[in-house]
């Protein structure tokens, strides 16, 4: 199984106002005299999310983050009370990119159901757009949300990420955006809440092998049917728990929603020499938005043809369909393996989510 999971650990230390005489002045400042106040110690880690309709790569191999741009550079945690009041809005910037962060303490009111919004890498230069078409920087929009104000639920929920022209997401040096929203029951006793955050991107990588009798020149590739627009936050997403071979429980995406959007073809031009009996990796990998493109041919819809790619070799286009990819949810890595033979081309696709990667002492930016 290919795993991702961003786990946020909430350690809640409950304190009744009547039992905390030394904190009486602080509690009075925070709210009602009979309120229960809880310290939430937040711990964030990576884990794995997968779409249940996709055929996974063979085995239980993990897909590590390939570089620091796929990890966390910043994190924002917004806690919202049941009456839609913003209880906390905290921005955290890391000295190095991280796959784990913890022990960030929040004092919140207990005995309530909270919404917890998570935003990582909000400094990325992605194009964010509101429902009315206004474009702005995500960081500036999130900074406008003040503690004690009403949370703009509808506005934030309808924000979209947009790609113009034939572009891909620019993640270098801007990092992959990540986000999620969770509902958390906060009681009046110590507790934990395991949460996760996922990348708002789909990644493509290409591996080309030449088994023909002649050297080849690869001049680029095309990725077809990419969405121009996707929701910033996961929209109407449903997860289910799946047990891996090691007994660990992971998440699979059963359903998700996308806005009405156009689809386009991304073209990457280059020049690679490919000797016979050699394999090359077409660098760099590219990043796109999640989507639900539907192929409509003469025979009607065919989910085995929803997504396709092209490889340009010696001036000719070789095209293949990704038959095991009916939809493209966020947090997915599509690895396309292409084998060129004398009279044919073989296509194989592995689809993997990312998973946690141990950080070495010299890892980071």
Where would I find each of the regions flagged by the language model?
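Sec-dependent bacterial lipoprotein signal peptides
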Residues: 1-19
């Amino acid at each position: 199984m290919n795993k991702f999971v961003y786990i946020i650990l909430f350690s809640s230390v409950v304190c009744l106002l009547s039992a905390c005489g030394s904190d009486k002045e602080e509690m009075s400042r925070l709210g009602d005299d009979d309120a229960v106040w809880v310290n939430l110690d937040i711990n964030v880690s990576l884990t794995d999310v997968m779409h249940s309709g996709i055929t996974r790569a063979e085995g239980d191999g993990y897909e590590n983050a390939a570089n620091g741009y796929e990890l966390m550079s910043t994190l924002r945690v917004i806690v919202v009370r049941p009456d839609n009041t913003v209880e906390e809005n905290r921005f955290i910037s890391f000295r190095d990119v991280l796959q784990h962060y913890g022990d960030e303490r929040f004092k919140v009111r207990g005995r309530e159901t909270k919404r917890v919004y998570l935003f990582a890498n909000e400094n990325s230069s992605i194009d964010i757009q509101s429902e009315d078409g206004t474009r702005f920087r995500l960081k500036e929009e999130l900074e406008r949300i003040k503690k004690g104000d009403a949370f703009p639920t509808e506005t934030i929920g309808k924000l979209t990420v947009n790609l113009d022209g034939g572009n891909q997401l620019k993640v270098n040096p801007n990092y992959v955006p990540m986000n999620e929203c969770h509902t958390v029951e906060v009681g009046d006793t110590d507790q934990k809440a395991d949460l996760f955050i996922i990348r708002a991107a789909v990644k493509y990588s290409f591996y080309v092998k030449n088994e023909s009798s002649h050297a080849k020149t690869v001049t680029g590739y095309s990725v077809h049917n990419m969405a121009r627009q996707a929701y910033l936050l996961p929209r109407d997403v449903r997860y289910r728990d799946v047990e891996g071979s090691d007994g660990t429980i992971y998440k699979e995406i059963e359903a998700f929603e996308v806005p009405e959007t156009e689809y386009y073809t991304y073209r990457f031009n280059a020049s690679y020499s490919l000797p016979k009996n050699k394999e090359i990796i077409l660098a760099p990998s590219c990043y796109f938005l999640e989507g639900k493109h539907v192929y409509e041919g003469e025979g009607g819809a065919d989910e085995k043809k929803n997504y396709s790619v092209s490889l340009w070799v010696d001036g000719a286009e070789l095209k293949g369909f990704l038959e095991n990819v009916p939809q493209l949810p966020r947090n997915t890595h599509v690895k396309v393996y292409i084998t060129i033979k004398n009279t044919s081309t073989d296509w194989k696709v592995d689809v993997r989510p990312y998973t946690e990667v141990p950080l070495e002492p010299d890892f980071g930016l």
